[in-house]
Curated annotation (Swiss-Prot):
Coiled-coil blocks: none
Disulfide bridge map: 86-102
Name this polypeptide is given: Natriuretic peptide Mf-NP
NADP listed as a keyword: no
GO aspect biological process, one term: vasodilation
Keywords: Disulfide bond, Hypotensive agent, Secreted, Signal, Toxin, Vasoactive, Vasodilator
Length: 139
């Protein structure tokens, strides 16, 4: 066997390229594609699942052609489960209690620092009151 140090100058690539020929005497065949390997071993598909999978497998098929009864029935069930909210009944209940839903009820914004401090400050002269009013209500 040839030493590894002799293969470093590009000889290693040559050995790797010739390796399939040395093993069989013929080059390797192309490997089968992923779908052809997987599809024969997959289990049969039920009618309900087939109605959903058909548009994905055959996108060129128009939506209104053929047997769309199962698909429309499934769509109807899915729409019933949603309820009136955005995400479905359970999530909408969580959203309304946590305030994270589609239309959360937001409390009034917190008062500014001036509005919290001023009522507790000492009485103010007329000149200062005018300045404070301008700060509280600009514009």
């Amino acid at each position: 066997m040839v030493g590894l140090s002799r293969l470093t100058g590009g000889g290693l690539l040559l050995v790797l390229a010739l390796l399939p020929l040395a093993l069989d005497g013929k080059p390797l065949e192309e490997a089968p594609t992923a779908p052809s390997r997987i599809i024969p071993f997959s289990r049969p598909v039920r009618k309900e699942s087939q109605a959903v999978l058909d548009p994905m497998v055959h996108p060129e098929r128009p939506a209104g052609s053929g047997d769309d009864g199962d698909l429309s029935r499934l769509e109807g069930l899915a729409k019933e489960a949603l309820g009136d909210g955005c995400f479905g009944l359970k999530l909408d209940r969580i959203g309304t209690s946590s305030g994270l839903g589609c239309n959360p009820k937001r409390p009034d914004p917190a008062p500014t620092a001036l509005a919290r401090i001023i009522p507790f400050s000492r009485p103010v002269r007329k000149e200062s009151r005018a300045a404070l009013d301008r700060m509280q209500h600009p514009g």
